[in-house]
């Protein structure tokens, strides 16, 4: 009996140390700065359309939005922060379907770059 318990504990320990196939490298799909100056998201709307959005009080001008696909290909588009509601919240929202290729199922990474450096966090989503 004692030997069976020891073997069971040993097997559980070994299984616990092995990486699980169900665990994947997930990036967050939204982020807001601690100061509240900006928020980013890579979510879907109610029509299941992918929305890549960056909203900010602080950022203006052009921004480069890059999506890295599961195939390791990267597509970048230049977009502009716009204040469409005249409320001093500037938004960039490039259209996923028309601006970025669908590279099939898997993890996608989204990065916003401005003035030569990354702006905000790396976000992600899965298809």
Predicted regions and their residues:
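Short, exposed beta-strand-loop hairpins at the edges of beta-sheets
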Residues: 55-57, 99-126
């Amino acid at each position: 009996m004692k030997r069976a318990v020891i073997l069971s504990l040993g097997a559980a320990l070994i299984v616990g140390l092995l990486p699980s196939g169900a665990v994947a490298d997930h990036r967050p799909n939204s982020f807001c700065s601690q100061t509240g100056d900006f928020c980013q998201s890579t979510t879907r709307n109610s029509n299941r359309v992918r929305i890549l959005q960056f909203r900010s009080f602080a950022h203006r001008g052009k921004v480069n939005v890059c999506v890295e696909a599961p195939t390791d290909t990267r597509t970048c588009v230049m977009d502009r922060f716009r204040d469409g509601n005249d409320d001093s919240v500037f938004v960039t929202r490039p259209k996923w379907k028309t601006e970025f290729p669908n590279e099939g199922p898997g993890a996608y990474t989204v990065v916003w770059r401005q003035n030569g450096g990354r702006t905000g966090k790396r976000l992600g989503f899965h298809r």
